[in-house]
Amino acid sequence: CLRVYQERVEYWSQFFDYLPKFSIRIRKMTTRWGVCNRGNNIVTLNSELIKKDITLLDYVIVHELSHFKEANHSNRFWNEVSIRYPNYKEARRALRD
């Protein structure tokens, strides 16, 4: 499980030019798929994502890494996400179902 998360984070990180040195945490969360803590440079990913299609894990990773540039969900934030993950709206819908 951890290996898959690490491989996907490593893959997606190459598409960002503004990432700080950050750590990954995997834990079960009840209300979120991921969290980016910019204060201590930790990205936490929900362990339940491993049960979903790999493309949804990819979306959450791109979403959280984009928070290193844009803290909130502004239009600029969604532009950052869409540059790297154009089908983000479909992924968001799938995670809500």
Predicted features, each with a name:
Residues E64:
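Walker B catalytic acidic pair
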Residues C1-Y59, F68-D97:
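Active-site-proximal or metal-binding-adjacent scaffold patches in catalytic folds
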